[in-house]
Regions:
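A charged helix-plus-loop insertion that forms the helical arch/lid used to bind
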Residues: 73-85
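Asparagine-centered polar/low-complexity signal
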Residues: 78-80, 104, 231
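Active-site glycine-centered loops adjacent to acidic/histidine catalytic or metal-binding residues
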Residues: 105, 132, 238
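ATP-binding/phosphotransfer module of carbohydrate and carboxylate kinases, centering on a glycine-rich
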Residues: 1-59, 68-72, 90-100, 112-128, ...
Length: 245
């Protein structure tokens, strides 16, 4: 069975048909740049471009970088603020003329990792953290998702954690892997103090370079592993969410 998945990010919108039996992309993903400003109409156009690239005519699952409840956006940290209180499912579904499901981006990635990736068969508290333009989070307790946790906005040294420890912060400040890993470690210690997880899964594009920074992180009790689906987890999870609606 195939469902189309789209992952809306702060820098890019990417998608592909997903093979739900294997938990993998059925075709090579297509990506367009996220418009700036990332307004609802502009982003909806970008999603439409990705879906039309595959001439897709079925159900579509879509991730969004913010809190989403019943298809409506509640926060918009890394896209235009005009998204707040927009019914994204109705807007994008109307643009595509297709049934859509919209959910938080990190929640989608977590759903995929818990089923097909690093969290498979893991009990207790598992937290997936996606590092990119911001920091997304997905918290699971015995396999059940606690949605819309947005732990990237925890305060760390007087600032949103994602302004110090995201991949964007590393790039903007030209931080070495060692310096950035120290910031990530402080962030993980803070999250661990609050939730005492058994496992941290590190996702986002930087998960492909886990060997450059994970060995530098010390003092965290929980096991820390890279996401197995890497940066495709959001696409896969979006398709999974759409298939269950």
């Amino acid at each position: 069975m195939q469902i189309f998945g789209v992952d809306i990010g702060g820098s890019g919108i990417k998608g592909a048909p997903v093979d739900l039996d294997r938990g993998d992309l059925a075709q090579e993903r297509h990506k367009v740049l996220t418009p700036h400003p990332a307004t609802p109409d502009g982003v909806a156009d970008g999603v439409a471009d990705v879906v039309k690239h595959f001439d897709w005519s079925g159900t579509v699952g879509i991730t969004f970088p913010g809190v989403v409840t019943d298809g409506t956006v509640r926060t918009a940290a890394n896209v235009d603020k005009s998204w707040i209180d927009v019914d994204a499912a109705t807007l994008i579904g109307g643009r595509l003329g297709l049934p859509v499901t919209v959910l938080n981006d990190a929640d989608a990635a977590g759903i995929a990792e818990m089923t097909f990736g690093a969290g498979r068969d893991r009990k207790g508290t598992v937290i997936l953290l996606t590092f990119g333009t911001g920091i997304g989070s997905a918290v699971f307790r015995n396999g059940r998702l606690v949605p819309n946790t947005e732990l990237g906005h925890l305060e760390l040294h007087g600032h949103d954690a994602e302004t110090r420890a995201s991949t964007k912060a590393k790039e903007d400040e030209d931080l070495s892997w060692h310096h950035w890993a120290h910031r990530v470690q402080k962030y993980l210690e803070h999250v661990e103090m609050l939730f005492s997880p058994e496992l941290f899964i590190i996702g986002g594009g930087v998960s492909r370079k886990a060997d450059k920074f994970l060995p530098l992180i010390e003092g965290v009790r929980a096991e820390i592993v890279p996401a197995e689906l890497e940066n495709n987890a959001g696409i896969v999870g979006a398709a999974m969410a759409a298939s269950s609606r």
